[in-house]
A protein has these predicted regions:
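Alpha-helical scaffolds flanking conserved acidic
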Residues: 66-75, 129-130, 198-201, 383
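C-terminal soluble interaction/assembly domains
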Residues: 341-343, 348-405
C-alpha cells in the first residue's frame, strides 16, 4: 500500500490523513477526473517546501525547537496568488504546486470540517479548524473578483480598518487570532509592524486539538537522559505504524479524529537536517514489523518566525519586490512586505493541541504471519515530527526538537 496515500502526521508541522473528497453532480467519470486534475496539488513539492522552510528556521534558531505550519502558510499565500499576475503568479503557482489553489482551498476546507467532530477524549476535544480574513486599510479598494474568490473559496471576509490607528488595528486582528486558536495564540500583530505604506493584511489560522485514539501514554516516574546533556521524564506507548529507511526510523500514533503524530528519529546522532532524512521515501517505506514501541518526552513550545528571507530563497523573491504584480488584488500597486507565522504545540500523554497563525502584510510599492518483529523508536535525542493528514497528504505542522528544557 502506498503510505503517502494514507498519511496524516505531525512534526512542528502537524497534519492529518485520506484521499481527497470530491463531489460532482451529474458528471461523467471523464469530467470528474478532469475536475480532480484541475485541483490537484503536487504533494512532493509541498513536502519539499515544508522541509526547506523548517530546515531554514532551524538554521536561524540553532539551539531551539522549531515548528512550522505549511498548511497555514499555503492558505495565506494561496489567497494572494488569486490576485497575482504574470511572473508573480507563476512563482506562487510553482511554490504552491498548483495553478488553482483556490479550488484546492475550497475542497480542503470542507475536508477539515469533517475532522472537527467536537468529541471529547481524555480531556481533549477533537477539533481541526481553519480560518482566513482580509484586513483592509481605509482608502484601499479590493478588486471585485479577488474579494469574491476570497469569500467563496477561503471563507475570508474583508474588514475595513484605519491602519493609521496602529494600536486599534493590531488589537482587532489579535482578537480574531485569539478567538480562532482557542486562546493558544493570542497575538500576531504589533504596532511597529505597520507603517504609512501598509495597505492590507491577510491572515490564516489553523487550530488542532485531539486526544489519542487509544489509551493515554504511560509516564515514567524517573528522569532519563535526552541527548547528551539534559534529563526528562518520558512517555511510552505502542504505536500504530512503523517506518524505516537508510536515514531514519519513525513511528506513527493516531489521534481520535484520525489525524496522526509521526515521530522521526535520525539514525545518525547529533544535529541533522530534515532534508537528509528523505521523509517522502520514509513515509512510503513498508518495513516488516509486528509491533512498534514508542518513547518520547512531553512537548510544550512555541515558534515565532519572519519567513520573508527564507521564502525569498525558495523562488518567491518577486512577491517582495517592486516588480511584483498584484494588480488583481486592489486598485493600488502593492507587494508583500512581511510574512510572519506563530505556532504553538502542547503534547502530553492524553493528547495534543497545536495552532498556527500566518499574517501576510502588503504595502504599496515603491505481511505474512511470522515470528513477531518488534521495532523500537525512542525519541531520546534530537528528533523531528509531523502532524499529518494522511488521507489528503497534507502536512499541517512540521517540527524539530533539540531540547526538552
Amino acid at each position: 500500500m502506498n503510505k503517502m496515500k494514507l498519511f496524516a502526521r505531525v512534526l512542528v508541522l502537524m497534519t492529518a490523513m485520506t484521499s481527497p473528497i470530491h463531489v460532482y453532480a451529474a458528471a461523467s467519470q471523464a469530467e470528474s477526473n478532469a475536475a480532480e486534475k484541475n485541483v490537484d496539488i503536487d504533494k512532493s513539492v509541498n513536502l519539499q517546501n515544508s522541509i526547506n522552510l523548517t530546515d531554514g528556521l532551524a538554521e536561524e534558531n540553532q539551539a531551539s525547537n522549531v515548528m512550522f505550519s505549511p498548511t497555514s502558510l499555503n492558505f495565506a499565500l494561496g489567497m494572494i496568488a488569486e490576485g497575482a499576475k504574470g511572473e508573480t503568479k507563476n512563482a506562487l503557482n510553482e511554490y504552491l504546486g498548483t495553478a488553482d489553489f483556490a479550488a484546492y482551498a475550497r475542497k480542503y476546507m470542507n475536508v477539515i470540517k469533517s475532522y472537527n467532530t467536537e468529541d471529547e477524549n481524555y480531556g481533549y476535544t477533537s477539533k481541526l479548524k481553519i480560518a482566513d480574513a482580509l484586513w483592509v486599510n481605509q482608502g484601499l479598494t479590493l478588486q471585485d473578483q479577488f474579494q469574491k474568490i476570497a469569500e467563496d473559496n477561503f471563507e475570508a471576509k474583508a474588514e475595513i480598518l484605519d491602519f493609521s490607528d496602529k494600536e486599534n488595528t493590531c488589537n482587532t486582528i489579535n482578537a480574531w487570532c485569539n478567538e480562532n486558536t482557542d486562546g493558544l495564540i493570542p497575538e500576531i500583530m504589533k504596532p511597529d509592524m505597520l507603517n504609512e505604506n501598509s495597505e492590507l493584511c491577510l491572515t490564516n489560522s489553523l487550530y488542532f486539538e485531539s486526544g489519542w485514539s487509544q489509551d493515554p501514554w504511560d509516564v515514567s516516574d524517573e528522569k532519563e537522559k535526552f541527548g547528551d546533556n539534559e534529563e526528562t521524564k518520558y512517555m511510552t506507548s505502542i504505536g500504530d505504524t512503523y517506518y524505516e529507511n537508510g536515514a531514519a526510523t519513525a513511528f506513527e500514533k493516531f489521534y481520535a479524529n484520525n489525524l496522526s503524530f509521526i515521530g522521526i528519529l535520525p539514525k545518525a546522532e547529533g544535529n541533522f537536517t530534515l532534508d537528509a532524512l528523505d521523509i517522502e521515501g520514509l513515509l512510503k517505506s513498508e518495513p516488516e514489523y509486528d509491533e512498534v514501541n514508542c518513547k518520547m518526552p512531553k512537548l510544550s513550545f512555541e515558534t515565532t518566525a519572519e519567513l520573508s528571507d527564507i521564502l525569498g530563497k525558495t523562488g518567491l523573491e518577486n512577491i517582495f519586490s517592486d516588480d511584483a504584480d498584484f494588480s488583481g488584488i486592489a486598485d493600488k500597486a502593492v507587494h508583500v512586505s512581511s510574512v510572519l507565522q506563530k505556532t504553538k504545540l502542547e503534547l502530553d500523554e492524553n493528547g495534543t493541541k497545536a495552532a498556527a497563525v500566518t499574517a501576510v502584510t502588503m504595502e504599496c510599492m515603491s505481511a505474512m504471519d511470522t515470528d513477531p518483529v518488534v521495532k523500537d523508536v525512542e525519541l531520546t535525542r534530537p528528533f523531528a515530527f509531523l502532524i499529518y493528514d494522511n488521507m489528503n497528504e497534507e502536512v499541517l505542522f512540521m517540527g524539530k526538537v533539540l531540547t526538552v528544557q
